Amino acid sequence: KTPAEKRSGDIKYLPKDFEYLKERFKVGHIYINDDNFFVNLLRVKDIAQGLLDRNLDISWEVLGAHAQTTARMTNDLIQLLDKSRCTGFLTGAESGSPRILELIKKNITVQMVIDANKKFVGTGIVPTYTFISSYPTETNDELKMTVNLMFRLLKDNKNIIPGNIKPFIEAGIGASVFS
């Protein structure tokens, strides 16, 4: 197994773990802090189905969903996540500037973020988008593009949380990104 596979564990245990937490500690909501949770969408489908099959009265959300991954989610998967009581996820939209997205090698486009956002309209799943500003060479016009993207995402889906724009220095991105 790869290190990521070892870390992600056997999916059959996660719904069981939720059930244990519900029974033992009366947990009503679980927050999963895993940037790689959504990498394997088949695994995510199995987890959501396992939670649904157990009919647990537990909602859950995930810190960590790459914008590429949310763009690949099918409507069927999104509906399954919603039925399994997934209430949200955090994803980095980063910038409204195509040039900046290319510069930081994010492997997403602005349109990809816009299209993925629309998929969650009408569900109980609340995407939280994070943004970063003040990249080296970023112009005021590019910063305005990011602000405009925030407003566009909110216009298209009133059920989102547009995170604040975090300055590049605080984001902890290394200079190696730009070499």
Model-derived features with residue positions:
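Flexible glycine/acidic-rich beta-alpha junction loops that bind and position SAM and/or redox cofactors
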Residues: L42, R99, L103-I104, S133-D141, ...
